[in-house]
């Protein structure tokens, strides 16, 4: 049975020229000024462990705060000689209908291998008030 070694939500993930998994800007919260909110780009970086050369079928699932599934992506993976497979799932223009705690899951069949929470929070925008006033002129004849 496959296992998840790690699962990170981040701004960007990729494999470099020598096979190092580069994971940039991990996060677990998104602040949005209004809902529905669209997040321009994010990436799931993960390492799946199985047997060397094993064909693995895993599914990514994004769940809404009410439990309904918002998105699903199925992936076929072949484990390397060490039994591991590094994966990057890039998500673009993901729409979040409401604030709350979303769930990111990696499944094999119906079994949840790993899950993470992603909180969507309504951002408080600063109130627009009158512009600041310059300081009052000082009396030049007055001693300090």
Where are these regions (language model features)?
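Contiguous segments within soluble domain cores/interaction surfaces
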Residues: 2-144
């Amino acid at each position: 049975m496959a296992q998840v070694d790690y699962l990170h939500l981040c701004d960007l993930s990729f494999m470099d020229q020598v096979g190092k998994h580069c994971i940039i800007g991990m996060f677990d919260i998104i602040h949005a000024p209004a809902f529905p909110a669209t997040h321009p780009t994010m990436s799931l970086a993960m390492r799946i462990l199985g047997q060397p050369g094993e064909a693995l079928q895993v599914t990514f699932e994004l769940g809404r705060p009410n439990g309904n599934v918002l998105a699903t992506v199925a992936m076929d993976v072949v484990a390397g000689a060490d039994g591991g497979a590094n994966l990057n799932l890039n998500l673009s223009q993901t729409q979040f209908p409401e604030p709350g705690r979303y769930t990111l899951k990696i499944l094999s069949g119906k079994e949840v291998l790993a899950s993470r929470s992603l909180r969507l929070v309504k951002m408080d925008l600063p109130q627009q008030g009158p512009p600041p006033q310059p300081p009052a002129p000082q009396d030049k004849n007055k001693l300090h």
